[in-house]
Amino acid sequence: MSSRTLYDKVWNFHQVKELPGGSTQLFIGLHLIHEVTSPQAFSALNEKKLGVKFPNLTVATVDHIVPTSNQQRPFSDPLAEEMLSTLEKNCKTHGIKFHGIGSNSQGVVHVMAPELGLTQPGMTVACGDSHTSTHGAFGAIAFGIGTSQVRDVLASQSLAMNKLKVRRIWVEGELQKGVYAKDLILHIIRHLGVKGGVGFAYEFAGPAIEKLSMEGRMTICNMAIEGGARCGYINPDETTFKYLKGKEHAPKGQEWDKAISWWKSLASDSKATFDDEIQLDGSSIEPTVTWGITPGQGISIKETIPNPEFLPKNEQQIAKDACKYMNLKPDEPIEGQSIDVCFIGSCTNGRLSDLQEASKIVKGNTVADGIRAFVVPGSQKVAKEAKEKGLDKIFLKAGFEWREPGCSMCLAMNPDKLEGRQISASSSNRNFKGRQGSAKGRTLLMSPAMVAAAAINGRVTDVRKFLQE
């Protein structure tokens, strides 16, 4: 019993029973829902005349389809209004807490749930959204699920799951100035590949990980799925406990002391056995930018676009496709590439610290001519705290647009979209073809501070140049 990983401990704690065929019925401690993947699930419940098993363990918000420039109801998009109205109705019918438009707690689901203290160490967390792995930053086992599984959790508060292998990614050293959690996770995905984590849960550990804030840790775990891992997690520690203390849904009084005791016991044992282990040097990582059409196609700011001919054979064709789609030439530098749009936000990088780091670059500068730049806080709470610190004024004075919370241009299921062949510098998580709303639109993923630097110069820029001034 002294050689278990956190994944083993949390899995065993939530295991209901073994199922025929080798899968496990796993109890889900927190179920998060939003307007996109829940309607069909509720319809299925209604057809079978089933209710929601534990309404108090499901929490809802609206984020994907909400406009960020004008959130007055009814929305101008009738489909978006219908999706929101449907979620409101379903939550009311089944007694589910809904953080909707007009609520001071509405926001992107993977931003608002942690800041309310809903996500806690040792939980199993499920949501009909790919980036549910975000919540692993707290020492939870969190994973995205499909609509049919959303139905199953609503009906039974459990899922049939197959246990994953665990790979520990140990990051030595400390990130240098101008290098952020986003750079680290892009670096990891680059080296392990977008399919490298298939069949694995990733445990992120080591000095460089331990030095990250909770918001940085959420960025890391958020993109574990982009490396193929179903979930990613970080062992809870004093940083975790300090973040949670006093949060609305965090334990209070004696219950807090009991929780701390249990949470401390969850960390992977010193003699835990992992299915695979990787070690990286965090101090050698530089600001990182994607150049292609997968999050794994990233390079440091000082590198050139890879020549497909010199890549492994299994990577050559997608690299050729990426160069053609992105209109980039092999061996040309990524630094200096022109951009059209700059987007700071998303469940990856729409938190207060992300906006603070970006504002340091923006302050006293002006957005370059012809560049459209906007900031979308990840939640109403983030927006409120940012305004209290005057961040909105810094961005507005520089020529950025300041928007209302929502998923925005991360996936463009709302009015925020690229047009034509526009290319964006984006703090989001995916750079797939057409991801940001235009079938021909192009995306360069980078940290919020790097996006800010790109907005000021009108092209991809090493943010460290601003930090030296």
From Swiss-Prot:
A GO term, aspect molecular function: 4 iron, 4 sulfur cluster binding
Binding annotation for [4Fe-4S] cluster: C347, C407, C410
Catalytic activity: (2R,3S)-3-isopropylmalate = (2S)-2-isopropylmalate
Required cofactor names: [4Fe-4S] cluster
Enzyme Commission number(s) from the entry: 4.2.1.33
Organism: Prochlorococcus marinus (strain NATL1A)
EC class (word): lyase
Pfam families: Aconitase (PF00330)
Oligomeric form and interacting partners: Heterodimer of LeuC and LeuD.
Protein name as it appears in the record: 3-isopropylmalate dehydratase large subunit
